[in-house]
A protein has these predicted regions:
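Residues lining hydrophobic/aromatic ligand-binding pockets adjacent to catalytic sites
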Residues: 1-218
Length: 218
């Protein structure tokens, strides 16, 4: 069982950790053993984390995309499932233009563009629900089977059950990742700036398409 925080278009290391829990057994019949994933649903919202931001590779280098949330009496005191996306601000067209500019030359961008943007354009009220829809989308496109459930109460690190691999607080934009991130893959601007690791999983998907899973599993 893997315990993770919700994240907006999460980084590659997030999916590499899930892929470690997902096994393929080859014999006369291919059988799938889904990853068991539990999302932290009882924590309070934390600013400057992957909960509402992701990192992409743009023409000028690595760029942060931040999803605005509604500030109601201090977001850090609100449970994560109560955080609302601020749809009153006209940020979505700008974010979509930024993604198009960064990835329109990627081999698989046009293949995934409309289906990915349709999730954003559905404008779910809650951040947690939007992130969950995006997570399921990326898992499906990468071919990772996962059974997802949610915490029903908050447990401090070190207090979880022995069979739970607790990665809360490990995957963070302000700290270098200590997790397996897979092997380098082709990126549009690598010739100019070099390979950039642990970007949003959409960077991997747009560049590697159906081969994305092979880049994070060995």
């Amino acid at each position: 069982m893997l315990l993770l925080e919700t994240a907006f278009m999460p980084p590659v290391s997030y999916f590499a950790a899930i892929a470690e829990e997902f096994t393929l057994s080859y014999g006369r019949v291919v059988s799938l053993v889904p990853a068991r994933l539990r999302l932290e649903a009882c924590e309070n919202y934390q600013k400057q984390s992957y909960r509402n931001r992701c990192r992409i590779y743009a023409a000028g280098g690595v760029e942060n995309l931040t999803l605005p949330v509604v500030h109601e009496g201090g977001t850090s005191s609100l449970p994560i499932r109560e955080i609302k996306v601020d749809w009153d601000r006209d940020w979505l067209p700008r974010m979509e233009r930024t993604i198009v500019s960064a990835y329109e030359s990627s081999p698989y961008f046009e293949y995934y563009r409309d289906s990915l943007f349709s999730i954003l354009e559905a404008r779910p009220e809650r951040l947690f629900d939007l992130n969950l829809s995006l997570l399921r989308y990326f898992l499906g496109k990468m071919g990772i089977a996962a059974e997802i459930d949610f915490t029903t109460e908050y447990e401090r690190p070190g207090e979880t059950a022995p069979d739970v691999r607790d990665l809360r607080g490990i995957i963070h934009p302000k700290r270098p990742s200590i997790l397996q991130m897979g092997k380098p893959y082709w990126q549009v601007f690598a010739a100019k700036y070099g390979f950039k690791s642990d970007l949003s999983v959409m960077d991997l998907l747009f560049n590697e398409g159906p081969d994305s899973l092979s880049c994070i599993r060995f």
